[in-house]
Regions:
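Short, compositionally biased low-complexity segments
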Residues: 15-17, 105-108
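Membrane-embedded, hydrophobic transmembrane alpha-helices
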Residues: 1-95
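Active-site lumenal/periplasmic loops and adjacent helix-entry segments of GT-C-fold
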Residues: 1, 93-101, 107-144
Length: 144
């Protein structure tokens, strides 16, 4: 259960860190990208870490991930500061939409965590191979 909480905290933090970027880049969407900030945060940090690791610029270790998250959050904070008035107006005007999107995410996240808790085994379809790749990637310090 503690792992689910850590995943939730991590995903929420990444989503919050990326929201100002999504707000600026996805301005044509009705929610200004709020509903995609969580996967966008995971993909952005993961892609940057993968590229930097594959090019042997930085090792693929926890410290590198933390630095990448801080850099992404810094850029996002700068975007938030430069668009703070517009961002504040949007959040105040669309708070019901933002809360609804967050509730939907939490219900789906916790529902899927409960569903997977009934059969957490890695014993069907491609999961054994996925698990092997996952274990190999944990031990690797570069993306090659």
């Amino acid at each position: 259960m503690l792992n689910v909480l850590w995943w939730l905290i991590t995903v929420e933090a990444l989503g919050l860190a990326v929201f100002p970027l999504a707000f600026y880049l996805l301005r044509r969407l009705p929610d200004r990208g709020f509903s995609v900030t969580k996967p966008l945060g995971i993909l952005l940090v993961g892609y940057i870490a993968w590229i930097l690791g594959a090019l042997n610029i930085v090792p693929a270790i926890r410290v590198s991930l933390i630095v990448i998250v801080l850099l992404v959050a810094s850029v996002s904070a700068w975007v938030a500061w430069t668009h703070r008035v517009e961002l504040k107006k949007f959040v105040m005007a669309e708070r019901r939409t933002l809360i609804a999107a967050e509730i939907i995410f939490l219900v789906m996240f916790l529902g899927w965590a409960m569903f997977r808790s009934y059969d957490p085994a890695i014993d069907h379809t491609e999961q054994p191979m996925d698990f092997a790749f996952f274990n190999a990637s944990i031990e690797a310090t570069s993306g090659q």
